[in-house]
C-alpha cells in the first residue's frame, strides 16, 4: 500500500502540561474536530477517549501516554497525550524522545506551574519545538497576559502571543488572530460555527500593540525580516508566518495561543498552528546513531529510501493482543511479518502484526513508513529505548534517559496462590515502565518495589490487583538512599586460597575517584603489559558492580564513582574469573576506609501555594524539615513558596499543610537531585540499618 500522507504533511506531536491544565480535554477536542470521535468525552465525567485505563478514569488524570493518529487539513497528525503528574515523568520523557514538536497546555489562571517547568526542561533537553496553548480562558480568574508573563519569568522562554482573547471567564467569546489581524467569533457551543470579522473597536489598539511586539520579536530571529522591519517596509502575513515557522522549528521562538478546550473554543486554530509552525520529520536534523560494527557515528535522514531504523519507546500489555511495542520510524519502510535486528540487544526479532492505535482501539496495517508512529505485536526481547533496524544496515540510536527511582516499599502476597502470580505481574509491569524496579532483599527475602513517588507505586499496586488479580499487603513507603565516595583513594584487593586441589588467586590495585553527580559508575582499564590478563578484566568490573549494589555504610547502592584498574598480578594455574571478582570486591571494601563514604538522599523541589496569612507557617514547615527556601512570589491573594526539601521529611506533609491552612493550601513536589545527608542523620540511618540487620 502506498504512503497516504507525504513526510511534509506529517506531524508527530506531544501534548504536555501540568496536571489539571486540561490537556486530555484538549486532545479529546482535537479528536472530535478531526472526525475521530462523534461524541465528546469529558475527563471529569470519567469518559475520556484517551484516558482508557480504569484508574485514569477514576482519578481523572492521565497515566500512560496514549498514542493516536488524526487528520487535519490534508495532514496526518500523530498525537501522544502525556501525563502531567510528576510521578509519571518517564512517560513524558519517552514521548519527547520520539516526537518532532509539542503543544504545551497552560491553565490560564495559573500560567506556568511546577510540572510545566519539568516538562519544559525535558523538551529543551531533547530540542523539541513547542507552541503554547493557554487553555481554560472561560475559568474564573483566567488571565492570558499573566500566563504569557510566566513563560518569560519562570522559563526564560522567548514566547509571544500570536493571538489575543476577546473577553475572558464567562465572557470569553472569541480570538484575535494577530497575523491576519482578524477576529474569530464563536456562535455556537460546539465551536463549529466561527465568524471571521474585523477586530472589535475596543480591542483594536491592544491588537496593534501586540502585533508590533510579535513582528519585532520574530524579526530578531531573521536577518532579512529585520532589515525590512528597520527600513519600515511592509511585512506580509506570509513572510511573518514563514519566519515564525523557522524560528519555532529552531527552538528560538514559542508562539502562544489561547482558548478553552472545555467550551470548544480555539482548538481548531491551535490545530492550524500545529500544521503551520511545528516541524514535519523533514524539518528536523537527521537522527544520529552508532554503527555497532565500526563504532562510527552514522545518520539516518527521514526518507522511505533509507534503510529501516526505529526506536521502541513504550511497552504495553494489551488484554487482547498481548505485548505491544510502540515505536517511531525514523527512516525506511517496514512490512508486517518481516524480521528486524534489535541492535541494542543484538537479537533478531520478527514483527508479527503492525497496529496503528487510537487511544486503546487499534487498526491493523500492513506497512509503516518513515515518520510514522505505530505498535508491533510479537517482539519478545525489545524494551524501552531499544533500536530496531534493518539487519544489513545496523545502527544504535540514542536511547531514553531513565531517572532513578526515589521511593520504595515492601510488598508481600496475601496468600500462597498470590505468590506466583505476583512475580509474573511485577515482571510485566516493570517491562512496561523502566522507572519501576522490582528487587528481592537478599537477607530477608522480601520483595521491594521502587518508583518515582507514592502515586506511581499506588497506581502500580492497584494495577496488580485489577489486571492480574493479585492481592498484596503493602508496607510503608521508604526513601531510596544512595551511597558514594567523597575522596579519591587507591586500594588493593588480594584473594588467595590454596587448600588442596585447584586454588584461587586474584590480585588488583584500583584507584577510586568521585564522579560527577548523576554520571553513575564508570570503569577504566589502565592495565599495561598484561599484569592482569585481558580475559579477567570484565570479572573485575563485574565484581565491583555487584559489591556496589550493597554499600559499605548502610547497604545502599554506591553511585557516581570512577574506578581505574591500574595494577595487579595473577597466577598461571590458580587465577580465575571468580578470584578476580572477589579481589575487586575486597578492593572496594578496603577503599571505603579512606574514601570518605557518604549517604545521599533524594532532594525534592517542593512548590507550596498558600493564602498570604499562612506564609509564616509554611516557612516554619520548610525549616523544620531540613529544607531551604529557593524563592517566593505572590499570585493574587496567595503566596507560592519554592523550596528544596529532603524526601524523607515530606511523608505526611499533606495532612500538616491541610490543617495549617484550613484545607486551602496545596503543594507539588518533583525529584531534583541527590545530596549528602547531614552527619547526625547519617549516623541515625546507619544505626537503624545495623539494628535491622
UniProtKB/Swiss-Prot annotation:
The keyword GTP-binding applies. Pfam families: EFG_C, EFG_III, EFG_IV, GTP_EFTU, GTP_EFTU_D2. GO terms for molecular function: GTP binding; GTPase activity; translation elongation factor activity. The keyword Protein biosynthesis applies. One of its GO terms (biological process) is ribosome disassembly. PROSITE patterns: G_TR_1, G_TR_2. GO terms for cellular component: cytoplasm. PANTHER family: RIBOSOME-RELEASING FACTOR 2, MITOCHONDRIAL (PTHR43261:SF1), TRANSLATION ELONGATION FACTOR G-RELATED (PTHR43261). Belongs to the TRAFAC class translation factor GTPase superfamily. Classic translation factor GTPase family. EF-G/EF-2 subfamily. This is Elongation factor G. It comes from Streptococcus sanguinis (strain SK36).
Amino acid at each position: 500500500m502506498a504512503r497516504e500522507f507525504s513526510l511534509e504533511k506529517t506531524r508527530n506531536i506531544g501534548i504536555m502540561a501540568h496536571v489539571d491544565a486540561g490537556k486530555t480535554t484538549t486532545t479529546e477536542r482535537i479528536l472530535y474536530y478531526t472526525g475521530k470521535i462523534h461524541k465528546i468525552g469529558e475527563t471529569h465525567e470519567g469518559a475520556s477517549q484517551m484516558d482508557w485505563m480504569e484508574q485514569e478514569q477514576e482519578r481523572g488524570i492521565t497515566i500512560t501516554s496514549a498514542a493516536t493518529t488524526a487528520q487535519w487539513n490534508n495532514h496526518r497528525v500523530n498525537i501522544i497525550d502525556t501525563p502531567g503528574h510528576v510521578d509519571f515523568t518517564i512517560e513524558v520523557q519517552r514521548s519527547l524522545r520520539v516526537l518532532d514538536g509539542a503543544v504545551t497546555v497552560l491553565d490560564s489562571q495559573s500560567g506556568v506551574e511546577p510540572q510545566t517547568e519539568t516538562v519544559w526542561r525535558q523538551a529543551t533537553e531533547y530540542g523539541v519545538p513547542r507552541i503554547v496553548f493557554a487553555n481554560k480562558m472561560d475559568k474564573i480568574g483566567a488571565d492570558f497576559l499573566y500566563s504569557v508573563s510566566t513563560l518569560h519569568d519562570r522559563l526564560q522562554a522567548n514566547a509571544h502571543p500570536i493571538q489575543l482573547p476577546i473577553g475572558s471567564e464567562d465572557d470569553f467569546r472569541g480570538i484575535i488572530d494577530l497575523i491576519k489581524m482578524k477576529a474569530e467569533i464563536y456562535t455556537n457551543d460546539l465551536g463549529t460555527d466561527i465568524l471571521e470579522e474585523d477586530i472589535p473597536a475596543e480591542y483594536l489598539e491592544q491588537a496593534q500593540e501586540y502585533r508590533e511586539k510579535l513582528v519585532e520579536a520574530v524579526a530578531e530571529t531573521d536577518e532579512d525580516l529585520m532589515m525590512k522591519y528597520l527600513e519600515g517596509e511592509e511585512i506580509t502575513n506570509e513572510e511573518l508566518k514563514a519566519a515564525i515557522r523557522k524560528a519555532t522549528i529552531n527552538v528560538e521562538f514559542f508562539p502562544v495561543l489561547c482558548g478553552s478546550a472545555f467550551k470548544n473554543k480555539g482548538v481548531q486554530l491551535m490545530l492550524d498552528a500545529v500544521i503551520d509552525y511545528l516541524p514535519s520529520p523533514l524539518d528536523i536534523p537527521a537522527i544520529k546513531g552508532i554503527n555497532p560494527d565500526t563504532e562510527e557515528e552514522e545518520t539516518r535522514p527521514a526518507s522511505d529510501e533509507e534503510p529501516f531504523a526505529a526506536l521502541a519507546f513504550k511497552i504495553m500489555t494489551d488484554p487482547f493482543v498481548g505485548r505491544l511495542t510502540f515505536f517511531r520510524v525514523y527512516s525506511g519502510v517496514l512490512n508486517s511479518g518481516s524480521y528486524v535486528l534489535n541492535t541494542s540487544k543484538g537479537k533478531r526479532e520478527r514483527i508479527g502484526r503492525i497496529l496503528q492505535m487510537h487511544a486503546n482501539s487499534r487498526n491493523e496495517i500492513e506497512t509503516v513508513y518513515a515518520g510514522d508512529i505505530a505498535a508491533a505485536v510479537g517482539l519478545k526481547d525489545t524494551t524501552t529505548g531499544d533500536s530496531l533496524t534493518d539487519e544489513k544496515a545496523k545502527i544504535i540510536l540514542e536511547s531514553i534517559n531513565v531517572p532513578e527511582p526515589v521511593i520504595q516499599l515492601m510488598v508481600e502476597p496475601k496468600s500462597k496462590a498470590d505468590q506466583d502470580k505476583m512475580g509474573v505481574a511485577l515482571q510485566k509491569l516493570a517491562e512496561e515502565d523502566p522507572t519501576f524496579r522490582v528487587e528481592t532483599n537478599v537477607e530477608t527475602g522480601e520483595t521491594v518495589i521502587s518508583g518515582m513517588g507514592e502515586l506511581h507505586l499506588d497506581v502500580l499496586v492497584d494495577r496488580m490487583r485489577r489486571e492480574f488479580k493479585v492481592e498484596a499487603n503493602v508496607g510503608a513507603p521508604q526513601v531510596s538512599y544512595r551511597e558514594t565516595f567523597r575522596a579519591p583513594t587507591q586500594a588493593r584487593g588480594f584473594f588467595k586460597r590454596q587448600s588442596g586441589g585447584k586454588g584461587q588467586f586474584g590480585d588488583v590495585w584500583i584507584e577510586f575517584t568521585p564522579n560527577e553527580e548523576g554520571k553513575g559508575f564508570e570503569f577504566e582499564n589502565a592495565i599495561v603489559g598484561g599484569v592482569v590478563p585481558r580475559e579477567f578484566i570484565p570479572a573485575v568490573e563485574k565484581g565491583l558492580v555487584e559489591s556496589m549494589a550493597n554499600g559499605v555504610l548502610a547497604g545502599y547502592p554506591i553511585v557516581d564513582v570512577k574506578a581505574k584498574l591500574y595494577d595487579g598480578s595473577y597466577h598461571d594455574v590458580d587465577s580465575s574469573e571468580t578470584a578476580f571478582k572477589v579481589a575487586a570486591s575486597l578492593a572496594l571494601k578496603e577503599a571505603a576506609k579512606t574514601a570518605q563514604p557518604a549517604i545521599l538522599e533524594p532532594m525534592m523541589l517542593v512548590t507550596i501555594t498558600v493564602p498570604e496569612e499562612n506564609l509564616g507557617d509554611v516557612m516554619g514547615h520548610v525549616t523544620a524539615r531540613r529544607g531551604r527556601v529557593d524563592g517566593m512570589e505572590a499570585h493574587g491573594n496567595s503566596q507560592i513558596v519554592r523550596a528544596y526539601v529532603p524526601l524523607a521529611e515530606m511523608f505526611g506533609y499533606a495532612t500538616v499543610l491541610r490543617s495549617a491552612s484550613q484545607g486551602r493550601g496545596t503543594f507539588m513536589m518533583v525529584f531534583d537531585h541527590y545530596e549528602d545527608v547531614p552527619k547526625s542523620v547519617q549516623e541515625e540511618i546507619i544505626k537503624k540499618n545495623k539494628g535491622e540487620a
